[in-house]
């Protein structure tokens, strides 16, 4: 069997609990690949990972390799081929006696975490390592981590697949179609309520989703906020943020990056901008992407963006620029 080293932060969290068995079962990296898994947590809860490791052993997957629990980011990411940065400080938590409510505070406190993680990954992970940021605010966390890694050979992504999957599900339901018939979904911009889950270039059975649904008022006034704000009703209903669906989206992203994209389709993730579509360079921005299955990821070019789309993309671009400004002292 081939072997791959995979590091996961936030290993004792709810997302990881749904994610980890699927990483070592053969589903994500293939049945011919043994997965050496490194689970990383803060010192206060790292002991809980021993129970998770016992459960992974008890699953009995042939593809499960070595299992390590650590509170040391350097030990965790050493020689990693994939690093999934799931852990982050959520809004509402109390740090040093202060409740973290403002997005600017959230950006800065997570910025410190992703500074350390980026430095360790840049120095110790595989030279061609792939890094997926799941922990929010994901785009700017990825910007900080990538900047601090100082290793341009490594590939950084922020996850927008959860938004893309939510968008596909809503479009399919409205059209009375199978979700598998919804293709070419792009979530432009930030993983936040300013995101633009593009219904004009998404297709249902090969036809523009907007044309297929034929209800422009629903598309622009109901569909968009439904997808953009989906996280809140999930929290309200279950008393916690999305976990299983977020884990599923992380797996979808890893598979989309590692495998060749189907001809004519694309997938959605946030990557460093190369200036495409007028997005400022190096901003971690949600784009339509293709993979050649050999590590080369390209931004799809030539997609038509109408005035409505361009206005929405400007809003999310401006938000990301303001986030970048808020953490500029961490980007030096």
Language-model features: locations:
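Residues forming the Rossmann-fold NAD(P)(H) cofactor-binding site
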Residues: 17
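Rossmann-like NAD(P)(H) cofactor-binding subdomain of soluble oxidoreductases
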Residues: 98-170
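N-terminal Rossmann NAD(P)H-binding glycine-rich loop of SDR-like oxidoreductase domains
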Residues: 8-12, 20
